[in-house]
UniProtKB/Swiss-Prot annotation:
The protein's assembly and partners: Component of the biogenesis of lysosome-related organelles complex 1 (BLOC-1) composed of BLOC1S1, BLOC1S2, BLOC1S3, BLOC1S4, BLOC1S5, BLOC1S6, DTNBP1/BLOC1S7 and SNAPIN/BLOC1S8. Octamer composed of one copy each BLOC1S1, BLOC1S2, BLOC1S3, BLOC1S4, BLOC1S5, BLOC1S6, DTNBP1/BLOC1S7 and SNAPIN/BLOC1S8. The BLOC-1 complex associates with the AP-3 protein complex and membrane protein cargos. Component of the BLOC-one-related complex (BORC) which is composed of BLOC1S1, BLOC1S2, BORCS5, BORCS6, BORCS7, BORCS8, KXD1 and SNAPIN.
InterPro entries named among the record's database cross-references: BLOC1S1 (IPR009395)
Coiled-coil segments: 27-59
One Gene Ontology cellular component: cytoplasmic side of lysosomal membrane
Compartments in which it is found: Mitochondrion intermembrane space; Mitochondrion matrix; Cytoplasm, Cytosol; Lysosome membrane
Pfam families given in the database record: GCN5L1
Annotated protein name in UniProt: Biogenesis of lysosome-related organelles complex 1 subunit 1
Major place of residence: mitochondrion
Gene Ontology biological process terms, A to Z: aerobic respiration; anterograde axonal transport; anterograde synaptic vesicle transport; endosomal transport; lysosome localization; melanosome organization; neuron projection development; organelle transport along microtubule
Protein encoded by which gene: BLOC1S1
Keyword presence, Transferase: yes
Superkingdom per UniProt: Eukaryota
Reactions this protein catalyses: L-lysyl-[protein] + acetyl-CoA = N(6)-acetyl-L-lysyl-[protein] + CoA + H(+)
Keyword set, alphabetical order: Coiled coil, Cytoplasm, Lysosome, Membrane, Mitochondrion, Transferase
Amino acid sequence: MAPGSRGERSSFRSRRGPGVPSPQPDVTMLSRLLKEHQAKQNERKELQEKRRREAITAATCLTEALVDHLNVGVAQAYMNQRKLDHEVKTLQVQAAQFAKQTGQWIGMVENFNQALKEIGDVENWARSIELDMRTIATALEYVYKGQLQSAPS
């Protein structure tokens, strides 16, 4: 069979020509491949480290933004609470003043009511006196008329 035909067992040796060294890995080629591999690994590590730093920076920015956003709400709630506390104190003071004023009004109304009762008592007393005086006046008039009629003229 002819070399290169199908029936022939192919081997690397049989295809080499005389004087060609056997294929052994070239040390410089392996060294170059190793350096390329290490360079690629270093590039990947640097890229990964860069991405990690970017992710940390982005996470930090996000965290700060969220905290700032929450702090705005918390600050607003705190301000609202302070306003409410102030309004409660003001309302308590006003309620106390109103209660005091109401007590004064009640006292004045009671005094006025007592004065009206006293005026009513005085009015009743005056009517009673007036009635007594009329009775006395009528009696005196009756006696006086009786004396005039019985006296000789």
